[in-house]
Regions:
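A cross-kingdom feature marking charged/low-complexity
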Residues: 38-69
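Short, well-ordered alpha-helical segments
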Residues: 2-37
Length: 69
């Protein structure tokens, strides 16, 4: 059984789904072994007739076990 670690990230987008996808895609660029995520907070910004969304995620991943020699 591996050790899990969690980090918090914020994604933005034109929809809540876009904001979640952006955060997960960015996490995948530097993290291996992502196992789950939880939406911590959803907020939005209105600029005229356009709404933008910001989603804070907690992302869990398994720490890699490497042998040092």
């Amino acid at each position: 059984v591996g050790v899990q670690k969690a980090i918090d990230l914020i994604g933005t987008g034109n929809s809540i789904q876009d904001a979640v996808t952006e955060a997960l895609d960015r996490a995948r660029l530097s993290l291996e072994g992502i196992t789950s995520f939880e939406v911590q907070r959803i907020s939005g910004v209105v600029d005229g007739s356009t709404a933008g969304y910001e989603v804070q995620l907690r992302i869990w991943f398994t720490l890699l076990e490497r042998m040092h020699g």
